[in-house]
Amino acid sequence: MNNSILLLAFSLCTLIATGDHAQDDYILTREYAVTIDGTSNLRDWKENVGQVTGDMTAIVNSDGSVDLVSIRIKMAVLSIKSDMGRVMDNKTYDALKATRYPDILFTLSTPLKLSQVSDCPQPVPVQGDLFLAGVCRPVVMQVKTLALDRGKLLFEGFEQIRMTDYAVKPPSALFGTMKAAPDITIHFKTNFIKPALSTLLKNQ
């Protein structure tokens, strides 16, 4: 029996066995994109987060709605790379206190139901806690959710934050000539999949 047949059989068995109100665990795949956008007195700048991990518990109902029970996403500070080069990278690590707090962490604080998981999803407010540089603050992100093939769930959205709210001093470079503004926007696109399906897909 080839992997495609195994994958189909697993998906059908899962659908029949669970129905509504069955919680499933998901893991974050490597198909993600997380960027940090900001501006300065000289020009706009962008940073890419290279290492992101996460897990989620959700209920996919027969009517197409999704109940989000828990989400945890972790971003490695030292994997952040700037389009302004290594000097800006090091300034970012210092500003985020990477030695003491190596990860940026988001956790869902309020479970919610997503009634529209369609080809054209509308953004919904998702409440969570953002832990950054040793400070934890509540956030409300606008998130779109899309159900993909092979049991994947895609989440796409953004969050605007002010660095000084997290006791982070905006980084500067070029001997202080370039000074970053305190407001930044975190954009993200993440895919979650059930661990067993992830294993089958890797073996195809």
Predicted region positions:
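Bacterial N-terminal signal peptides that target proteins for export
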Residues: M1-L7
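Bacterial N-terminal signal peptides
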Residues: L7-L15
